[in-house]
């Protein structure tokens, strides 16, 4: 991955992993015990994190698996989860989604996209009471 985004209720962080300082902080956060990290579509990311950051991610929760365990048959992404849990539509910019995430400097729209994505996953995790 080129970018790692994390969120709490109050703050969101977007780490560009080409930057050595960002990589070091991201590696520390991802490998830290006692801190849950949750998201959607994390299967491939785990392998790439190990390769790129040299750490084994700890306490990672694939939210799609939670929905599957609750009986949902189809994959549940963040948009579907927001619809199910909050009865709201979560819009994601196709332009930002398909933009160059390896860029030296992310645009404001990319930062907003990444932060919103992380915050939405946090809200889903929180609403599920996990």
Residue ranges of predicted features:
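Conserved DEDDh/DEDDy metal-dependent 3′-5′ exonuclease domain
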Residues: 1-127
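Short arginine-rich
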Residues: 130
């Amino acid at each position: 991955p080129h970018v790692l985004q994390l969120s709490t209720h109050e703050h969101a962080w977007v780490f560009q992993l080409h930057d050595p300082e960002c990589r070091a902080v991201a590696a520390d956060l991802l490998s830290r015990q006692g801190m849950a990290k949750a998201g959607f579509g994390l299967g491939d990311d785990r392998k790439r994190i190990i390769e790129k950051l040299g750490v084994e991610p700890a306490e990672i929760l694939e939210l799609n698996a939670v929905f599957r365990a609750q009986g949902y048959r189809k994959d549940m992404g963040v948009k579907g989860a927001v619809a199910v849990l909050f009865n709201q539509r979560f819009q994601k910019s196709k332009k930002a989604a398909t933009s160059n995430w390896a860029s030296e400097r992310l645009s404001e729209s990319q930062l907003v996209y990444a932060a919103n994505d992380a915050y939405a996953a946090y809200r889903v995790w929180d609403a599920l009471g996990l």
